[in-house]
Amino acid sequence: MYKGILKYTTIMMALASASVFSAQPPSSPMSLNSGQTLQNMPQVTMQAMDNAALRERDARRLASASEPVLQFAEPIAVSITPEADWTSLPTIQGERSYSVWRTKISSPGALSLNLGFEEFYMPEGGALFVYSASGEQMIRPFTAKDNEDHGQLWTPMITGDAVIIEVNIPSDKVEFLRLKLTSVNHGYVGSDLQDVFLESRIMSGSCNVDVVCPAGDDWRQQIRSVAAYSTGGSLFCTGSVLNNTANDGKGYFLTADHCGITASNAASLVTYWNFENSYCREPGSGDSGGNGDGQLNQFNTGAIFRAGNSSSDFTLVELDDPFDPAHNVYLSGWNANATLNTSAVGIHHPNVDEKRISFENDNVVRTNYSSSTPNNNGTHVQVIDWDLGTTEPGSSGSPLFDQNKRVIGQLHGGSAACGND
């Protein structure tokens, strides 16, 4: 058997709020709760794209890439602001007037959409909502708590080819709102949300092992530290949260340099937590190589670039916001010792798929990238072959753990796949 080598290293209407003068923002879109319908809602439609052609383009690129990064969406540059289309509707009971603006964004044929706002500042008491045209999918409200020094906001994906952007804001605060949509990202690979078109999915190999399987029982804490993430609304990789010597709970997130995070685009990072199948699919089965049932509804958005190095292929960012306790994120330990005498475990998201786990029972080797010669001063750790599971495009940046459950590197590249461990 050939042994694959792996190297780690958003019309305006005036409404009233029953919570008069409260600074609390609305928890759901007022346009949906008011019983009022908005006629002639502004719509912006993107030019149609050929999803199959985009996937074929990427397949050619990935076939020759030694450092594969999975692209799942095509960015479309736009410039959309809520400076027009402000219309008033009759107010309802209460004393404080709220204003609502919304518009529909469509990209025909998209399997998913996500949005990038290069200008975002939400005054206290206001909220931005992004939801599907049917109203069935809705991202949590973005409020003043999401204001950051870099002034940007990037959203997680929503399934389908149309979304509605809605702003609810106290009318006396409208002049302070800053909002500019600059990127509509047309998903052509898909996601594992339930109503994605199954025939368009690029699925991970059947030999992969779901983290919910018994094989992952000894790694439950470490599994909670690993996330799939997107940058620029178009590229997917994997990364992990690390503890630090101050034990202060900061969100230091480790991934691969070749995944392309820089100081200029770190604000666009969106991490997805607990994106996992709900049951163990038997490794090697058609079920394991098929569509999963994981959800992409637990996320952090935005980060600050802290460090990176191309030779060892690492990037470290600090996530903008604290972790939501409901997401149960774990901060993994790490081991920077030069001497390695350990088996290894990889936890990762292959091909934008639910989280998987892989095992190497033999000792890993310290070496350099593109070399198989042992080198105690090398920049990389080599996994000669996986004994259970594998890694694939999308796994890049995922952590490699030693036998003591400490991170010793992140996935750089290699030729592993089902049948080529």
Where are these regions (language model features)?
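Protease-domain processing segments flanking chymotrypsin-fold serine proteases, especially trypsin-like
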Residues: 22-101, 145-243
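Extended extracellular/luminal ectodomain segments enriched in beta-structured repeat modules
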Residues: 107-114
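Serine endopeptidase catalytic core focused on the charge-relay Asp
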Residues: 158-384
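Short, surface-exposed beta-strand/strand-loop-strand elements in extracellular ectodomains
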Residues: 121-136
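A short, polar/charged loop-to-alpha-helix boundary motif
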Residues: 417-421
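Short beta->alpha transition motifs characteristic of CBS
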Residues: 256-259, 350-351, 393, 410-416
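Gram-negative bacterial Sec-dependent N-terminal signal peptides
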Residues: 1-21
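Catalytic nucleophile loop of clan PA
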Residues: 240-251, 389-411
